[in-house]
Swiss-Prot record:
Residues 153-382 form the Radical SAM core domain. One of its GO terms (biological process) is tRNA modification. SMART domains: Elp3. This is Ribosomal protein uS12 methylthiotransferase RimO. Its EC number is 2.8.4.4. [4Fe-4S] cluster 1 binds at residues 22, 58, 91. It comes from Leptospira biflexa serovar Patoc (strain Patoc 1 / ATCC 23582 / Paris).
């Protein structure tokens, strides 16, 4: 009979997960976390204290790949000091498994995407002597451990719940379908179960994520039904929808923003460009006028809503006229949050083989032109926030105050407000008055 953690004096092995990349990777790390617990491992306070250090990687763009490689090298240095097993998982492992095997012998094991919930089984199979025979966890204990340390950014007042994996869009700049495969829905019952578990563990905000949220069920009505079900979970305060592809499905989905007050006043819709010719080259739909209309509809439905979008500069064939069209859009529509990416050709994508490739220096120049335009509009946006009071949540408690986040801002990626009020609690809801701003973040006063 396998032993239970609560009826043995043996000390089980421990693990720590370092997570790189987007919130979708955080969800995958959570799946690994639960799988490792079920196999008898316990979470460690940091990689140095772990017996197994897992690095969940990202390789979406060139900068992400560089960060992944550096993190692996840093983890190898940690391993030399502490002798733990180093396991590289996720997108980079999927893409560069042979290179990891050939060039990084210090990596004890690597595996790609689609196996996160089997991480414990994979480690047990590959390192049988490292495992204690601990598999029968008390259910209450397992829930407590699931929300404890052992994974970066896990113990927060918000949680991410992934509703699908993979993508069918086929954007010519994107490597994701090669790494994660075709689009696959997560069963709605599993989405609800994950939401309930997160709320029970203390999360007040749930962020629904995927590579393509509006593709869920291949039918907007099914997605809307799912959103309604998640919003109805008892104890949930805020529901945030992320990664909404800018098309007619998103336009229809906006009706839920009027129907369900729990949905955060926040629209994240990555446009990637506004020039019709560049979008066509990217194998994407839409144009300047449709995007402008979409964002205006969102603001009409929820006047307190703020918009986050992203643009890729320097895609093959892009002209300065195309860049100027993005600048005009930023200055005309004034999305509150703009993320800019320099195009980097990804092996295995159509974009990498297209004519009209631009030099890195020219791409950087174009990024800077759009950034300057955005920072100009952001200054005006910030000035209009001064003196206004916003609902907010405490994301981090500091010695001399706290970091709070308006509901118009998503966790980890958007602006925060620094307040000097003490005795606030993590996850506490209240209101903040914006008093001043920096380039991106703000400072304010807790008023509730």
């Amino acid at each position: 009979m396998p032993k239970s953690l609560e009826n043995t004096n043996e000390t089980p092995k421990s693990f720590f997960i370092t997570t790189l990349g987007c919130p979708k990777n955080t969800v995958d790390s959570m799946a690994m976390h639960q799988s490792l617990l079920k196999e008898g491992l316990l979470p460690a306070a940091g990689p140095e204290a772990s017996d197994f250090h897992l690095v969940n990687t990202c390789t979406f763009i060139q900068d992400a790949t560089k960060e992944t490689i550096q993190t692996i090298l840093d983890s190898i240095d940690i391993k030399k000091q502490n002798k733990q097993k180093l396991v590289v998982v996720g997108c980079f492992a999927e893409r560069a498994g042979k290179e990891i095997s050939d060039d990084l012998p210090e990596v004890d094991l690597h595996f790609g995407t689609g196996k996160y919930d089997k991480a414990g089984e994979i480690l047990r199979k590959n390192f049988p002597l490292e495992f204690k025979d601990l598999t029968e966890f008390n259910e209450d204990l397992l829930e407590r451990l699931t929300t404890s340390k052992g994974i970066e950014n896990y113990s927060k007042p918000y949680s991410y719940v992934k509703i699908s994996d993979g993508c069918n869009r086929g954007c010519h700049f994107c490597i994701i379908p090669n790494l994660r495969g075709k689009y696959r829905d997560t069963d709605s019952n599993d989405v609800l179960e994950q939401t309930k578990l997160a709320v029970k563990a203390g999360s007040k905000e749930i962020c629904l994520v995927s590579q393509d949220t509006v593709f869920y069920g291949k039918d907007t009505d099914k997605l809307m039904d799912l959103v309604r079900s998640v919003a109805a979970v008892e104890g949930l305060e805020i529901l945030r929808l992320l990664y909404l592809y800018p098309d007619k499905k998103t336009e229809k989905l906006l009706d839920l923003y009027r129907e369900i007050p729990k949905i955060a006043p926040y629209l994240e819709s990555p446009l990637q460009h506004v020039s019709k010719s560049v979008l066509k080259s990217m194998n994407r739909t839409g144009d300047y006028e449709f995007f402008k209309s979409l964002f205006q509809k969102a603001r009409d439905i929820r006047p307190d809503l703020e918009i986050r979008t992203s643009f890729i500069l320097g895609f093959p064939g892009e002209t300065m006229e195309d860049v100027e069209e993005i600048i005009r859009f930023v200055e005309d529509v004034k999305p509150e949050k703009v993320n800019l990416f320099p195009y980097s050709p990804q092996e295995g994508t159509k974009g990498a083989t297209m004519d009209g490739q631009l030099k890195d220096k020219e791409i950087a120049r174009r990024v800077n032109l759009v950034r300057e335009a955005y920072l100009g509009t952001l200054k005006t946006i910030h000035q209009n926030r001064i003196g206004k009071i916003y609902p907010c949540v405490v994301d981090e408690v500091l010695d001399d105050g706290a970091i709070v986040r308006r509901l118009q801002d998503a966790p980890e990626i958007d602006e925060v407000v620094y307040v000097e009020t003490k005795d606030l609690k993590l996850g506490q809801f209240g209101k903040v008055r914006v008093d001043s701003f920096y380039e991106l973040d703000m400072s304010g006063t807790w008023v509730d």
